[in-house]
């Protein structure tokens, strides 16, 4: 899949844009002032496969905690700043790898210059985060409504503020809870600038609804070569955001590592408790780091036949099942032992 070429920026040890891989981001939902809990959550996100993590910085206590946080985690930390430019300066001083701000809401040009200068000295990029819920009044008055054109104009205005103070290590996000508006906005902005784009559907919802909306929005753009880093916004454990984000990237071939898991939807031919088996296999595969494709199929029609491309899998029978590798049957196993035998074979691969 051909990606649209963008400028490359460095976020801590991670590159975003250019020829670098598409990365997965998340945001902590702990109180940043509680450095212990925030560090614990970031470490869980790292284990899940997160590449970059963002922390809210609502006040100076939170900004001060960033010093302890950044010293004790491996992931690059992005400080999420609104309104007070001094929080951005404090965050930079305390070791963050990037800022997320809207230059237009942190004050005068002089204040923007101070933030940009400080970020430039530390080689820290700035993400301009435009959101459909926080458009400027003059833009809303111009368009009379929130729309893709309005969001893009807001983003370009913020870009110009930074460019005017000679700052170009920029990442852009234009998020909306309306999936079609989000898609249209990124399509438009990708034609206007070559800065890396951070994809996401804001306020996407709970794990179920949010996964659907994010997969459609982010997936559509990735299929068109648009996007350099992604964040799946979910109401829930941030680790789930990372899991969903990584699966989206796997689907489009942007992430080759880790297990790809497939299973059939079951039908009248299914004679084993495939739903229970599939859920158990999927859960146990979370601890597997091997880059393999695993299939759990309800009958011999779907597996090993239709699942021939899988590295290993199960095909159900009546009270028993077949374990196959690359379409070749290797053993017949009783239903109650299927999962254990499958995992044993995977461990030996």
Curated annotation (Swiss-Prot):
Annotated metabolic or biological route of this protein: Isoprenoid biosynthesis; isopentenyl diphosphate biosynthesis via DXP pathway; isopentenyl diphosphate from 1-deoxy-D-xylulose 5-phosphate: step 5/6
Keywords per UniProt: 4Fe-4S, Iron, Iron-sulfur, Isoprene biosynthesis, Metal-binding, Oxidoreductase
A molecular function GO annotation: 4-hydroxy-3-methylbut-2-en-1-yl diphosphate synthase activity (ferredoxin)
One Pfam family linked to the record: GcpE
Catalytic activity, reaction form: (2E)-4-hydroxy-3-methylbut-2-enyl diphosphate + oxidized [flavodoxin] + H2O + 2 H(+) = 2-C-methyl-D-erythritol 2,4-cyclic diphosphate + reduced [flavodoxin]
Gene3D superfamilies for the chain: Dihydropteroate synthase-like, Sulfite Reductase Hemoprotein, domain 1
Binding site for [4Fe-4S] cluster: 264, 267, 299, 306
Note describing how the cofactor binds: Binds 1 [4Fe-4S] cluster.
Cofactors, names only: [4Fe-4S] cluster
Principal EC category: oxidoreductase
Superkingdom assignment: Bacteria
The protein's role, per its UniProt record: Converts 2C-methyl-D-erythritol 2,4-cyclodiphosphate (ME-2,4cPP) into 1-hydroxy-2-methyl-2-(E)-butenyl 4-diphosphate.
Name this polypeptide is given: 4-hydroxy-3-methylbut-2-en-1-yl diphosphate synthase (flavodoxin)
Gene name of the encoded protein: ispG
């Amino acid at each position: 899949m051909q990606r649209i070429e963008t400028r490359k920026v460095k976020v801590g040890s991670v590159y975003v844009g250019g020829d670098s891989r598409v990365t997965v981001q998340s945001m902590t939902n702990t109180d940043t002032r509680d450095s212990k809990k925030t560090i614990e959550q970031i470490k869980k996100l790292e284990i899940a496969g997160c590449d970059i993590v963002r922390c809210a910085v609502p006040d100076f206590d939170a900004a001060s905690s960033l010093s302890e946080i950044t010293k004790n985690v491996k992931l690059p930390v992005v400080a999420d700043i609104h309104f007070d430019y001094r929080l951005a300066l404090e965050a930079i001083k305390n070791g963050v790898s990037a800022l997320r701000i809207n230059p237009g809401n942190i004050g005068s040009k002089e204040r923007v210059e101070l933030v940009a200068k400080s970020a430039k000295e530390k080689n820290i990029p700035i993400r301009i985060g435009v959101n459909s819920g926080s458009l400027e009044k003059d833009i809303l008055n111009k368009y009379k409504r929130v729309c893709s054109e309005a969001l893009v104009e807001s983003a370009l205005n913020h870009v110009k503020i930074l460019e005017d103070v000679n700052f170009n290590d920029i990442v852009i996000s234009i998020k909306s809870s309306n999936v079609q508006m989000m898609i249209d906005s990124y399509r438009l902005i990708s034609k206007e600038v070559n800065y890396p784009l951070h994809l996401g559907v804001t306020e996407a919802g709970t794990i179920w609804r949010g996964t659907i909306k994010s997969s459609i929005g982010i997936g559509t753009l990735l299929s068109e070569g648009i996007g350099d880093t992604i964040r799946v916004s979910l109401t829930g454990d941030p680790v789930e955001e990372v899991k969903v984000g990584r699966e989206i990237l796997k689907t489009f071939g942007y992430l080759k590592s880790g297990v790809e898991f497939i299973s059939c939807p079951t039908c009248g031919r299914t004679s084993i408790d495939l739903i229970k088996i599939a859920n158990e296999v999927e859960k146990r595969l979370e601890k597997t780091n091997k880059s393999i494709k695993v299939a759990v199929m309800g009958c011999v029609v779907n597996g090993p036949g239709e699942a021939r491309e899988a590295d290993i899998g199960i095909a159900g029978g009546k009270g028993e099942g077949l374990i196959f590798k690359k379409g070749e049957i290797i053993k017949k196993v009783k239903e109650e032992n299927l999962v254990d035998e499958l995992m044993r074979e995977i461990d030996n691969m």
